[in-house]
Design a protein with these regions (language model features):
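Bacterial Sec-dependent N-terminal signal peptides
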Residues: 1-25
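Carbohydrate-interacting regions of secretory-pathway proteins
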Residues: 17-214
């Protein structure tokens, strides 16, 4: 009987711990990039566009996108906070896609792009929710590291550059998109880094996510 009571107490304890851990996942930042390999990442159409140098992902080459395909949330995020350290070089364009899916070729059609661009000819600057809520101001310089932060909670997207909020967008309930952009909406999905073109060279490191309750 004593052993049975001990077993019951332990069972309740472990289930409680498991439940607490699930509820508290939003309290922990989880790294998506180990700094050494492309484990859990999958590149599209031109994989050679992405390289690893000194613990950084370097995007430089023909159009390609690097999708997170790892075990965290089974690479299917709905509500979350994401942050990454980013550095652009002069004339470079890139982006971070959210709520997207792996796509073999072309610009990802699902989800939203958060712009990385401090000096390239496209007027939509770093922090823009591309084509939806665009930023004209330049908040950071080329050749300097900055933090790009993205939060999705419900129908709201918050984007910060070095702790400064540059976008606070709420998706309308009666959302309508053109036929060529029907999947540009909040749902759930993974993240992707963009390799825009051979003239663009952008660095990423310290890519962290904090899942939030659905």
């Amino acid at each position: 009987m004593k052993n049975f009571l001990v077993f019951c107490c332990l069972t309740v304890f472990f289930y409680s711990c498991g439940g607490s851990k699930k509820l508290n996942t939003g309290d922990q930042w989880i790294s998506l990039f180990d700094g050494k390999s492309f484990n859990n990442w999958k590149a599209s159409e031109n994989p050679s566009t992405f390289k690893i140098e000194d613990g950084m992902i370097v995007a430089n080459g023909p159009r390609a996108h690097l999708f997170y395909e790892g075990p965290v949330q089974n690479h299917n995020f709905k509500n979350f906070e994401l942050k990454a350290r980013v550095m652009t070089t002069p004339g470079s364009n890139s982006g971070i896609f959210i709520h997207t899916n792996y796509q073999e070729t072309g610009w990802p059609s699902k989800g939203y792009e958060v712009q990385v661009n401090n000096s390239q000819s496209d007027w939509r600057r770093t922090g823009s929710l591309y084509g939806i809520d665009d930023v004209k101001e330049v908040y950071v310089k080329d050749n300097e590291w900055y933090t790009e932060y993205i939060k999705v909670e419900g129908k709201n997207i918050t984007i910060k550059i070095n702790d400064k909020t540059v976008v606070d967008y709420t998706e309308p309930a009666n959302l309508e998109r053109p036929k060529d952009a029907l999947e540009k909406r909040l749902s759930s999905g993974t993240f992707a880094l963009q390799g825009h073109d051979p003239g663009s060279k952008v660095y990423f490191k310290e890519i962290l996510v904090r899942p939030l309750p659905d």
